[in-house]
Amino acid sequence: GAIPGGVNKSLTRQERDYLQEDIYRVIAWSREAVELVRRLHQSNRPLYDGFGAFRSSMLSIVAPDGALDLYDGELRARDADGRILVDRGDCSRYWELIFEEVKPWSYMKFPFLRSLGPQAGWYKVGPLARVQNCDRIDAPLADAARREFIDYGGGRPVHSPLEYHWTRMIEMLAAAEQIKDLLHD
């Protein structure tokens, strides 16, 4: 039978059991990585919060209930201060929300939120946007780490590129927790 997601076979019971043996270690390592990055940021906030920081809007997908979603969801955009600009945007009609500009000095295209225009409508994506755009993460340890990250910013978005690393570790922890749940399903 067909298996979704590009997987070419189901796990055997032996393969599943083998992976179950290590998943708790992976979760522990992921928690340690989140803690390490948190401690680094707290040890020198001026460096970690200021280095390369640039304020911008954020764009990501979230689940219909606002949870972190890495694959299929709805568009959410926030401005640099955290106010929601777009919520529950239809990904299949993204062109109504996002436009691209071409610059004569580059082969790249420069996307922006239509409602803000090309000068103010550019945005960041990736883990820093996803973790700050979602309302929660459906993995308890990762969600606690997300809340701690949001508290670190005083409830306002943070914009330093070094903070991408912290949010990458939060997403890694979420993935490990979700893998554990799938292995026990």
Task: Give each language-model segment a name.
Residues 1-185:
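Active-site bordering "gate/hinge" segments
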